[in-house]
C-alpha cells in the first residue's frame, strides 16, 4: 500500500500543535500529588472540553453486542474450564466499559465483597476510578481482594482521567496533558526502553492507549496486573517469559493443559506492523482531528473504525480511494479468519485426543511434551485472534503467529496419535456435537441455565446497591 511518509509527517506536524505532554508522576511534586485527588466523573470536564466530551459520550452509539461464542463455538472447547467459555462478546464503545464487565458471565454473581471468582485486577482497564483508587490506596491496596470489592467504587466509565492529567494547568488550558494513570503500565514501558516522560509525542499518544490495549497477567498473591514484556513483546518472547515462571491462567478441563489466555494485545501487534514502525499512532487512525460547527479543530473521542472518518485518517497518507483500501483490508481479514478456523479445528481435536489419552491411562511424563505443544499452539493462536484489528495493524505478523500455531498443533496431534496407538487406540477420536454455542457448552459440562439465573439475580439485587452507595459517597452524579 502506498504511503507518502513526508506528506504524512508534514500533515501531522500541521494538524497537531506541539503540546507539552508529561506524566502526572513527573509533573507533580510528591506533596501536591498527595493532595490532588483524581476526578473520575467524566461529566466534570464537559464545560472545559465540550467537543471532546460529547464525542466521547457518542461511544454509547456503539451499542451492538456481538456474541463471539455463538459465531464460533469452537472457542468454548478451547477455553473449557475458563470463564471465557461462558461468555465472550466482541468489544463495543468505551461508554459501556463498566456495564459490560458487570454484565459478563465471566465475573460471576458475587453476593458480598469477599465473594466471586475474579480479583480486583479485572476492573483495571474499565474506569478512571481505578486511577483514583490507586492514588488513594496505593497499588497493593487497590489490587487486594475480590472483584466485587470494587463494585461500589468503580462506577464511572473509561474516560478523561484514564489518559489525561486532568488536575494539571495544561489540561485546564485545553492541552492534552497525556499521562499514564496506571503505574504498572509506566513500569512496563520502562522495561522495553520507553520511559513515558522521555518519549516523543507520537510514542506517548500510543503509550496512553497501551495502558489497556495490551497483553497482561495477574501476578503474585495479590493478583496485580503485570505486562509480560521482560523478554520482549513478540509472541515468542512472552511465551518464553511465561514458561520461565511456570505461569498459567487456567488448566483446560478436557486436555488438562496448563493454558495461557491472551487478552487484547493491540499495542504489541501495532508495534510489529507497518503503521507502528512509521510512527502512525492509534490517535492518527482512531481519534483524528475534526472540526466542530464553528470550524475549530479538536480530537474526536468517538474512538472507532478509521473508515468512518476516511478523509481525516487514511486519506492523509494513502492515495487510494476508500473502496480500494476497504477491499485490501477485507482480503487481509478473510485470510486471517480462514487460517484462524483451521488452527481452531486442529486444537479442538487436540484437546479431545489428549482427554482420550488421559482416559486410556497416559502418564504425566508421557503427556508433558504434548501438553506443551498444545499450550504453545493455543497461545500463539490466541495472541493473534485476541488482537482486535490485527488484519490492519499487523496482518503479516498475524498470519505468521497463526502459521506457527498450526505447526505446534500438528506436532501435538502427531505425538498424540503415537501415544494413543501404544494404548491400543488407533481409530479417530470422535468429537461431540459442538455446532452451536449451547451444544459446545453442554459438551464441557456447563449448566448455563443456572449460571444465567445467578447473573440476573446479581444484576437485579447487588448492582443497584453498588450504585446507591456510590451516589451517597459522591462518586456518581445524582
From Swiss-Prot:
Binds 1 Ca(2+) ion per monomer. Binds 5 heme c groups covalently per monomer. Keywords: Calcium, Electron transport, Heme, Iron, Metal-binding, Oxidoreductase, Periplasm, Signal, Transport. It comes from the Bacteria. Heme c 5 binds at residues 275, 314, 317-318. Disulfide bonds: none annotated. It is an enzyme of class 1 (oxidoreductase). Heme c 2 binds at residues 160, 163-164, 301. It is found in: Periplasm. Ca(2+) binds at residues 215-216, 261, 263. Heme c 4 binds at residues 282, 285-286, 393. Its cofactor is Ca(2+); heme c. One of its GO terms (biological process) is nitrate assimilation. Its main location: periplasm. It catalyses: 6 Fe(III)-[cytochrome c] + NH4(+) + 2 H2O = 6 Fe(II)-[cytochrome c] + nitrite + 8 H(+). GO terms for molecular function: calcium ion binding; heme binding; iron ion binding; nitrite reductase (cytochrome, ammonia-forming) activity. Residues 1-26 form the signal peptide. Substrate binds at residues 216, 264. Pathway: Nitrogen metabolism; nitrate reduction (assimilation). Its EC number is 1.7.2.2. GO terms for cellular component: outer membrane-bounded periplasmic space. Heme c 3 binds at residues 94, 209, 212-213. Pfam families: Cytochrom_C552. Heme binds at residues 122, 125-126. Catalyzes the reduction of nitrite to ammonia, consuming six electrons in the process. Belongs to the cytochrome c-552 family. This is Cytochrome c-552. The gene is nrfA.
